[in-house]
Amino acid sequence: MSEVTTNEYNEDGKLIRKIRSFVRREGRLTKGQENAMKECWPTMGIDYQKQLLDWKEVFGNDNPVVLEIGFGMGASLVEMAKNAPEKNFFGIEVHSPGVGACLSDAREAGISNLRVMCHDAVEVFEHMIPNDSLATLQLFFPDPWHKKRHHKRRIVQLEFAEMVRQKLIPNEGIFHMATDWENYAEHMIEIMNQAPGYRNIAEAGDYIPRPEERPLTKFEARGHRLGHGVWDIKFKRVS
């Protein structure tokens, strides 16, 4: 895989230069992860190609598609797929051990409504995801880039929000974000309030309680015990 970069923006959210949003990180796979990659990739893995996907062809049905960017080790994604067999789940992750772990868990769970990719998310969106096709886009706990001088590297920017909007089903699709970094939550709200074609679906304030469909991770549960917050945000595509 060639090296990729993230996008960098100015204070107005305008693209300054392309530095890809995710970098493919190779890592050492455990034997279990390696076996899962070999055994499960033919049925659950999707190779990158500059060609739009046909969701019915990918999953064998017309069920709603939930896409997650950066699923980590995949435990939550597998749990969501197991709990919602009436939906299709599509995960993109650049860390190959995470993809292997996800496939291993998916095999153990016996689910068939999950597909995964190991590639740069922006390239996948640009070349493979059909417009107006996603029921939900999930972005859970992305890199917060804590230092102020690095805030421009955060994936949630106006151009990214527009890219997501184009892929969501009109007047129906949901962009669901979650972060445990309050400053990033505020940044997400600021960007999404500026992004055209969206409406915050929170009934009171900017944030929503953790939805039942998003599993509570071990890391998150530990954070709760220590008094750390987590902010869930949902915006609906309205135009």
Swiss-Prot record:
Pathway terms, separated by semicolons: tRNA modification; N(7)-methylguanine-tRNA biosynthesis
Catalyzed chemical reaction(s): guanosine(46) in tRNA + S-adenosyl-L-methionine = N(7)-methylguanosine(46) in tRNA + S-adenosyl-L-homocysteine
Entry superkingdom: Bacteria
SUPFAM superfamilies in the record: S-adenosyl-L-methionine-dependent methyltransferases (SSF53335)
EC number(s) stated in the UniProt entry for this protein: 2.1.1.33
Binding residues for S-adenosyl-L-methionine: 68, 93, 120, 143
GO cellular component: tRNA methyltransferase complex
Transmembrane region(s): none
One GO MF term attached to the UniProt entry: tRNA (guanine(46)-N7)-methyltransferase activity
Assigned keywords, A-Z: Methyltransferase, S-adenosyl-L-methionine, Transferase, tRNA processing
Residues reported to bind substrate: 147, 180, 217-220
Active site, renumbered: 143
HAMAP family per the UniProt record, alphabetical: tRNA_methyltr_TrmB
Recorded family membership: Belongs to the class I-like SAM-binding methyltransferase superfamily. TrmB family.
Protein role: Catalyzes the formation of N(7)-methylguanine at position 46 (m7G46) in tRNA.
PANTHER family per record: 3-DEOXY-D-MANNO-OCTULOSONIC-ACID TRANSFERASE/TRNA GUANINE-N 7 - -METHYLTRANSFERASE, PENTACOTRIPEPTIDE-REPEAT REGION OF PRORP DOMAIN-CONTAINING PROTEIN
Descriptive protein name: tRNA (guanine-N(7)-)-methyltransferase
Species for this entry: Vibrio vulnificus (strain YJ016)
Taxonomic lineage from the root: Bacteria, Pseudomonadati, Pseudomonadota, Gammaproteobacteria, Vibrionales
Gene (name only): trmB
